[in-house]
């Protein structure tokens, strides 16, 4: 007899941050969201490939994020609004 298992996938929490400009650089956005403490820390985690932008690994700290874009770091998702 085969038993069926029900699996629940826990959704990652999404934190929304409003910007007042056309875009924001990825490193500045991580600081704005308090995902990192300093710009230096942001630089290292981005260069090490620990950050995803819109679901894809991004190693460019100067990446421009616009409203609707998401950044994922340490199992948390941050959305630009």
Tell where the protein language model's regions lie, with residue ranges:
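Short, structured beta-strand/loop micro-motifs enriched in basic residues and often containing a Trp
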Residues: 49-56
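Short beta-strand/loop turn elements enriched in aromatics
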Residues: 32-45
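Ferredoxin-like alpha/beta domains used as RNA- or RNAP-binding modules
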Residues: 1-33, 57-81
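Residues that recognize and position ribonucleotide moieties
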Residues: 22, 44, 51
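Residue-level recognition of conserved structural "scaffold" positions that shape functional pockets
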Residues: 46-47, 62
């Amino acid at each position: 007899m085969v038993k069926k298992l029900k699996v629940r996938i826990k959704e990652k929490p999404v934190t929304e941050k409003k910007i007042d400009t056309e875009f924001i650089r990825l490193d500045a956005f991580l600081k704005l969201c308090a995902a990192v403490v300093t710009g230096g820390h942001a630089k290292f985690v981005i260069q090490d490939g620990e950050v995803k932008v819109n679901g894809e690994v991004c190693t460019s700290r100067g990446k421009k994020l616009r409203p609707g874009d998401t950044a994922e770091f340490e199992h948390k998702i941050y959305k630009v609004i």
